Amino acid sequence: MKVFGYIGSGICNIWNIYNFLFKNYHVSMYAKEVSTFLDNDYADSALYINFRSMPNVMDGLKQSGRKVVYVCKKKALKEPQKVSNLAGAVIDASQYLHGNTSLEGVIVTLAQDYCGANNIPLLEGVGSFGTRMFPQPSASRYIFAKQQPYFNLLFNPADDVNMEKQYFEGSEIEPRFYVPALPLVLINGGTGIGVGFSSRILGRSVENMITVIRNTLQGKRNLDRYFHPQWKGFKGSVVKIGDNKWEISGVMSRKGKSKVEVTELPVPYTWNDYMKTLRTLRDAGVIKKFSDNSDPSTDTFGFEITLDDSEAEKSDSEIMSDLKLVNTITECFTCIDRDNAIKEYSSAREIFEDYFNVRMEYLRKRIDSETERLSKEVSVLDETYRFISGVVKGAIKVSKLNRKDLESLLESKGFTAIDRLTSLPIYSLTLDKAQEAKDRLDMKMKELEEFRKETPESQWTKDLDAIESALKGR
């Protein structure tokens, strides 16, 4: 059956089919060929789940996160808004169908900025959005969120006109994807579990990804070293041990023969995770005792551990392993691609190349649409100047004409924005206003002339310059 060709196969899918069938259909009331059911009902459901669960290669967002970004752009959310209220606004404006609680969690996730969360959060949280030690945020009615200062630098409003629009029951909703100035799917990472597919992408450094973009724009290709996973503030190590396989280690130092101090945990461990681990190790006789010196005010870990005598004789690497300070993660690069299809990428580099090519395509569209916009503005300013100047110089006499005759006169002189021109207030038909109109026209023509020199490379470079400036000192 063709369904297994695009949602995977195996015992997990057989169980999914069983659950779907008995949750959605009463056996005595519904009869259908198994192959028809699998190729239609189940396949549609599976694809919908996957589209909700997997990040998009272009903007790194799942469907719900994109709805939040869409509403933030639409509302120009520059002032903090209660998370519970923002969730309600997203539901109203983007046809979100899965309830407030789930959406509030999405908003919180977009704002979290501790080590192991977002390397570049899209929203700025006001209140307790969780920390690395204690990730649980406060209730949504007590915390607020707004756009980050660099939000519109990542999602340039000039690109909005070129986004692929979507509609639900006649209402416009979020676009299929955005084309941010940075590859957010690699910078912030992402996870997702769908039907027959899963995704696990680790975060990368913002600075490294900017370096990769700048070098790629210059035609340089040997950039694999910049795709190493990295989290802001992480003091441990990340070592490649296989294809897309990484060994993430915390930090441990000896304090005498049988004592060690742990000052960093491997991502994504939390304080609570490691406290449970230490109790298990103590019960198993691997360690004798431990004390917790972690500091919640600085979100830093500190554990002093007394080892069992036999454990103390081992090497540092063996002790690190026994104390669960080494975590192995294999990345799985499954994303929704630009064609809205599920695609399993082989590496972070392949994801970047797909993102880069589509982004360049949309920068060319930006140049075309901005050139068209500026040309229209020049045309409007030119007509305004010609009209006011004509009235001032007496070439266009308006005082003894009715509106219909005036419109005919303007048409004969090649004017097009007639309604706007005939609605100008009388005080604008003066010599000084004519000069102001000429100055505005000259400025706009110069702006258009300069913009005609732009290329996708120069536009992207300007975006990166602005983002780097906004991120300084962050």
Describe the function of each predicted region:
Residues 219-474:
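Charged, surface-exposed alpha-helical interface/stalk elements
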Residues 21-243, 304:
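Catalytic phosphate-handling regions of large nucleic-acid enzymes and associated NTPases
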Residues 4-6, 18-25:
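Aromatic (phenylalanine/tyrosine) cluster motif
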